């Protein structure tokens, strides 16, 4: 044992002598020790920061495909306590209309309303006594295939264990967006497999501005309101909670205009879908009709045109990718969704397959025809005020000509302040073929069941 101790002492004294005699070697070993210490400290700090982040920080990520993405950006632009180093500009073009009829058109001003939203980078906001870091990231490689815009995400991080702060924030952002779109109607169109807003929200149209036969307008409006009030009635009886409407009649009778005004009356948006659109398949159609935005009606315009060649060439030969059976399954098949209102329009009801318009797929059929004496008088009064004799004279001229309501409105627009000129010009309107309600009860051969 004494020999071993003596050997260790000799070795230690030798190393000490070597280090004291070689300053470079001593400095190198010192630097190695210092570097190792820094590496251990760095690893400890990273582990500690990661632990603190897991235990004390809460984060939520909002991808650009989410509807709350734009809502949050525009809400954040209104936050007073905000620190942003980088901003992005978004503009909205609005046309300032003349204040009175005497103002000349060249005085109309195209205004652009600019809003500064947070740009890519890190920003900080204070919300309900909590500081939140907002990081907006934009990918240089990934793109949204439906819009062609770069893929973006927003990450919210706060030093709080209360996850409810994010729910409250996003709910407030959603309410902010809804208040900004109050008294507006958003038009959606199909982009790939999802609905995207088409342009900016439009001002609601008053239902009274669409002149239809009073019984038709009241019948449809009352039926829709009754449907929306009785969801529980459908549930308790096991009936699918959906409603289908068919508006048919000659061109210019007000089918689309009425739906736009009805959506405003209901405070609903409109999803427009063209069945003849290139690339629209059965699966995509089914997905779109099963994922309609909340509080929105679906409009299938000119539904007859998508399948007008089907009877002649079969399901393989017509120009659209949607099959007739695919449409029927999307409307009321096993995978079709509930809580849905669908409006179809057509100028040629005789071309529709009976399987498409049977109850369950089309529950209400309404004929919107050419101008009737009642409609002529009502529209005349709206434009020129009360003048029964002149309104009757106009009615005697246009009704035998089977004039459409669109043509009648165009006549009034051309003669804004001269009802007498409108009556004289009405004599030059062309004669149109008569149009009458179609009898769907007549037995016709069905191509599908």
From Swiss-Prot:
Species per Swiss-Prot/TrEMBL record: Schizosaccharomyces pombe (strain 972 / ATCC 24843) (Fission yeast)
Record-annotated membrane-spanning stretches: 21-41
Molecular functions per Gene Ontology: ATP binding; ATP hydrolysis activity; protein carrier chaperone
Highest taxon in the source lineage: Eukaryota
Keyword presence, Mitochondrion: yes
Name this polypeptide is given: Probable mitochondrial chaperone bcs1
Catalytic reaction(s) noted: ATP + H2O = ADP + phosphate + H(+)
PANTHER family associated with the record: BCS1 AAA-TYPE ATPASE (PTHR23070)
A Gene Ontology biological process term: mitochondrial respiratory chain complex III assembly
CDD domains, per the entry: RecA-like_BCS1 (cd19510)
Topology with respect to the bilayer: Single-pass membrane protein
Lineage: Eukaryota, Fungi, Dikarya, Ascomycota, Taphrinomycotina
Binding, ATP: 249-256
EC id: 3.6.1.-
